[in-house]
Design a protein with these regions (language model features):
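Short hydrophobic/Thr-rich beta-strand motif most characteristic of the beta2 strand and flanking loop
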Residues: 25-34, 40-41
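The feature encodes the CheY-like receiver
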Residues: 14, 56, 86, 104
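Active-site residues of response regulator receiver
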Residues: 52, 82
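His-Asp phosphorelay/catalytic-motif detector in bacterial-type signaling
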Residues: 45-47, 72-77
């Protein structure tokens, strides 16, 4: 069982992600913004982070760069899960350190795998 942090401001999407991952045997914690995510990340490190790009308080790419800059978090796998679907967006995500890039809408089987 993995601990997965979901950073997503759309409650419907975060609930789908969380429900699907919990059904696959994982533990999840949902965060609607960067501020609440940083607070928890300082306390406990997850096995995986699912990160949206368009968040209310801070761009997901900025959050990703901060994750990669810190010694204690730089090795945590991060998957961008976003509505930004262009090739340029995907390249930006991967160039900034994302381990993978999924676009919305996504399939539950794709998410769980």
């Amino acid at each position: 069982m993995a601990l997965i942090y979901i950073v997503e401001d759309d409650k419907n999407i975060s609930e789908i992600e969380s429900f699907s991952l919990k059904n696959a045997g994982h533990q999840t914690v949902e965060f609607p913004d960067g501020r609440s995510f940083y607070k928890e990340l300082a306390e406990k490190k997850p096995d995986l982070i699912l990160l949206d790009i368009m968040l209310p308080d801070e761009d997901g790419l900025s959050i990703l760069r901060k994750i990669r800059e810190k010694r204690e978090t730089k090795r945590i796998p991060v998957i961008m899960v976003t509505a930004k679907t262009t090739e340029i967006d995907k390249v930006k995500g991967l160039d900034n350190g994302a381990d993978d890039y999924m676009t919305k809408p996504f399939g539950v089987m794709e998410l769980v795998s």
